Amino acid sequence: VNPPLAPDTEVPDPTEPRAEGTAARPGPYDAHPSARAVRARGPAAPPRRWTHDALRELALACGADDAAAVSLDHPELADEREHVLRALPGTRTLVCLVGRMHPDSVRSPARSVANLEFHRAGQALDEVAHRVSVALSESGHRSLNPAMAFPMEMDAFPGRGWIVSHKRVAVAAQLGRMGIHRSVIHPRFGSFVLLATLLTTAEIDGGPPPLEFDPCLGCRLCIAACPVGAIEPDGFRFSACYDHNYREFMSGFADLAETIADSPSALSLRERVSQSEMASMWQSLSYKPNYKAAYCLAVCPAGEDVLGPFLERRAAHTRDVVKPLLDKEETVYVVAGSDAEAHVQKRFPHKKVRVVRSSLRPPSAVALFRSMPLTFQRGPAKGWKARFHFELGGEDAARATVVIDDGALHVAHELEGEADVHVRCEGRVWLEIVEKRRSPVLAVLTGRLRVRGDRALLSKLAACFPR
């Protein structure tokens, strides 16, 4: 048992700088056996200086299929800096690791096979990242590896839970380009890759060669394959992808839990949720969360190691890879009144539509306006124009301008131009109205909500953001 410090023992302040040229004063821990053992070793070796090529060789030796490093000061990573430094103060370099997936497994209409490959490749990549991180730490540089996917910082949910954006780092490190399906396409491995990122205090000499072409072929097969129409030539419909493909992740589980809570009996619950849906959610909770589609990755022919068969037999690629996914009879999860619902009914009438509640629920008024581009539906916004001003007060205050322009959306976090409709209330009140927890009519009658302009336009605006 270590003896307690004597009452008159002076405990040094670790933050107090020592005058230059003065010897370290004996501390209260110097007599400890571990401290004596450390002192006996002598001074530590200076940290190793890493070149980019040597670091890449280390990553490949640890099991990565490709790797590259990029400075945290890279201009494309400015939004990552705050989050990275919070996780590892002193970070100078981000090391992106690439793990290849088996294309045939990802392409299987049996999605259990595809999900097994996602999970296998993800776990393997996390192990690789751990080995590289330990090697860098042993060379004298603090290093850590955030998860390839999960766990995340869920106390921040529904905000940013990830420590670093692997996709942004991969693009900045010249390991690929972002495709229209919003996944990174590697020049060799195509879309069949998973990504991980190391944070390290090491400063790397040199950098990766520039990627001078876009691996995307422009074939648009990802657009054709998406069951909810989330991918368009001029944009990506985030909410459509999130509500279906990620149904068995965070928000989908919360929606199911609320459905259980809302059901007055077991019989009522069975009428709302099928046995297969309940069993599928159980499977994701018991093992790892499963994607409902990811067909955009499955059909992508890009990448030198993947492209050959597509170039030689395009009809066979359509017959053997694309068509089985298009023809598959399955449940597709959509929000009522969304563009995704209309897309499934028109494009895939043989697929079963399952209407669910929107799983994107902003926690504040500011978050509400910031999330609008993610939940906006073009269909209900076509054929009319209007400008809305919102002045929300109280603890959850926010000011915003929302413009609907014949299927397009513009959001500014200040008041701009002359409004057709002007809304004033507390931020908390408006959130409750948006979430249908408060009647807007009663809010007007009680003076909690003041609206100037054509109130019918507010109903049209609400239809653009179905919940």
Question: Could you describe each region identified by the protein language model?
Answer:
Residues V1-P3, P7, V106-S108, F253, ...:
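Short conserved micro-motifs at the rims of enzyme active sites and ligand-binding pockets
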Residues D320-R467:
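Feature captures hydrophobic
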Residues D66-A69, L144, R387:
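Short, hydrophobic-rich beta-strand element in sensory/regulatory alpha-beta domains
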Residues A61-D66, H141, G379-G383:
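Short secondary-structure junctions
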Residues T91, L194, C296, A386, ...:
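Residues that flank catalytic or metal-binding motifs in active/ligand-binding sites
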Residues L85-G90, I185-F192, L415:
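Short glycine/proline-enriched loop/turn "hinge" motifs that connect secondary-structure elements
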Residues N2-L125:
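Non-catalytic, usually N-terminal nucleic-acid engagement modules in DNA/RNA processing proteins
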Residues A78, A114-N115, R120-E304, G308-D320:
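Catalytic cores of enzyme domains
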